[in-house]
Amino acid sequence: MAIKKGELMNNRGKLELKKMVVAAMFVALTVSLSGFSIPVGTAKCFPVQHMMNVIAAVFLGPVYAVLSAFVTSVIRNIMGTGSLLAFPGSMVGALLCALIYQKSKKLWACYIGEIIGTGIIGGLLAYPVALLLMGNAKVATFTFVLPFLISTCGGTLIAAILIGIMDKTKVLDYLKRQIR
């Protein structure tokens, strides 16, 4: 089997080089903007991560959206600019909004998926992370839901504005075609 330009091969099939490069650029952009955070309660609220979750979901699909969220969380933790709470929120939000967008092709559904995935499901999954991995026995089950909701609503709103502009100017479809 020959390797075509723009593709890499692994034991499961092909990985698209363009998607990998775009995902890496999204990670770099997200990490470089990690200084923009809003402390709310016990969590670092980071709207840029949620904005990039939505953008990665729309452009890259579920696998690369989740990988982008994971790699961003790892790098931010290594740099000391993130916390372990970033993993459940960002990855679940990226997965849910990407799966919903993949099935429906509706942007509004993607936005709702990010808010539910990060704000509610990710907020609830942050509780065992805080309790078991961070040793914080004082947190309650719903401690992280409100801060995560605030953060994801802000990031999703920014993404909706950017994607809306790209959609109206036909840039969205053009960029999607370039990545495929």
Where are these regions (language model features)?
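Loop-helix junctions at membrane interfaces
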Residues: 1-180
